[in-house]
Amino acid sequence: MASSSLFLLASLLVLASWQQAIAFDPSPLQDFCVADMASPVRVNGFPCKNPMNVTSDDFFNAAKFDMPRNTMNKVGSNVTNLNVINFPGLNTLGISLARIDYAPMGVNPPHVHPRATELLTVLEGTLYVGFVTSNPNRLFSKVVHKGDVFVFPKAMIHFQMNLDHNKPAVAQSALSSQNPGVITIASAIFGSTPPISDDVLVKAFQVEKKVIDWLKSQFSENNHY
């Protein structure tokens, strides 16, 4: 009987630990915690605004997600993020949103959200989407159409491309963090500040230094799309 009770207790502790471990953002300990962006306090996240000063406007954002964005750039895409940085009411709620506009043949380059899973819905057009796993780097990709949904697991390198040569495309993503973060792979490698040593990149990519220099020149203006 004692051993059964001990096993049950151990199982409950493992379950509790597992539930805590899989939480991407800390769980809220109150009804809401609107971020106080003016507070000098620095914590893992943002401190709460005095709840007595919270209004309905703290839970509203005129994001204009129905409006097309400018995609006139090198990659032909534009990501509009709605997260705790520009929507403090999302603090501790573990969710954020993004609208992605694609020019004809536009690409949302390979990137990572280190703190979130992404659920993408195609609103207009046809996209080629995919993600790559950790080593040995298996690719999962699919052509998705208007109304289709595709999920990118947390911290996996992923991308999207508009397959239409003439028409723009639009998608909307829900992310499982108030502040997912983004690391655009090419920009991080070839446009970091300070730059990564050429010796490292020449050896890593097995190319000549002039190729590395050319690649770095493409990201010298902090084009972190």
Swiss-Prot record:
<dbReference type="Pfam" id="PF00190">
    <property type="entry name" value="Cupin_1"/>
</dbReference>
<feature type="binding site">
    <location>
        <position position="118"/>
    </location>
    <ligand>
        <name>Mn(2+)</name>
    </ligand>
</feature>
<dbReference type="InterPro" id="IPR006045">
    <property type="entry name" value="Cupin_1"/>
</dbReference>
<feature type="binding site">
    <location>
        <position position="113"/>
    </location>
    <ligand>
        <name>Mn(2+)</name>
    </ligand>
</feature>
<feature type="glycosylation site" description="N-linked (GlcNAc...) asparagine">
    <location>
        <position position="53"/>
    </location>
</feature>
<feature type="binding site">
    <location>
        <position position="158"/>
    </location>
    <ligand>
        <name>Mn(2+)</name>
    </ligand>
</feature>
<dbReference type="InterPro" id="IPR019780">
    <property type="entry name" value="Germin_Mn-BS"/>
</dbReference>
<keyword id="KW-0325">Glycoprotein</keyword>
<keyword id="KW-0964">Secreted</keyword>
<keyword id="KW-0732">Signal</keyword>
<feature type="signal peptide">
    <location>
        <begin position="1"/>
        <end position="23"/>
    </location>
</feature>
<keyword id="KW-0464">Manganese</keyword>
<comment type="function">
    <text>Plays a role in broad-spectrum disease resistance. Probably has no oxalate oxidase activity even if the active site is conserved.</text>
</comment>
<comment type="similarity">
    <text>Belongs to the germin family.</text>
</comment>
<dbReference type="InterPro" id="IPR014710">
    <property type="entry name" value="RmlC-like_jellyroll"/>
</dbReference>
<feature type="disulfide bond">
    <location>
        <begin position="33"/>
        <end position="48"/>
    </location>
</feature>
<feature type="binding site">
    <location>
        <position position="111"/>
    </location>
    <ligand>
        <name>Mn(2+)</name>
    </ligand>
</feature>
<comment type="subunit">
    <text>Oligomer (believed to be a pentamer but probably hexamer).</text>
</comment>
<dbReference type="InterPro" id="IPR001929">
    <property type="entry name" value="Germin"/>
</dbReference>
<dbReference type="InterPro" id="IPR011051">
    <property type="entry name" value="RmlC_Cupin_sf"/>
</dbReference>
<protein>
    <recommendedName>
        <fullName>Germin-like protein 8-3</fullName>
    </recommendedName>
</protein>
<feature type="glycosylation site" description="N-linked (GlcNAc...) asparagine">
    <location>
        <position position="78"/>
    </location>
</feature>
<feature type="domain" description="Cupin type-1">
    <location>
        <begin position="60"/>
        <end position="213"/>
    </location>
</feature>
<keyword id="KW-1015">Disulfide bond</keyword>
<keyword id="KW-0479">Metal-binding</keyword>
<dbReference type="GO" id="GO:0030145">
    <property type="term" value="F:manganese ion binding"/>
</dbReference>
<dbReference type="GO" id="GO:0048046">
    <property type="term" value="C:apoplast"/>
</dbReference>
<keyword id="KW-0052">Apoplast</keyword>
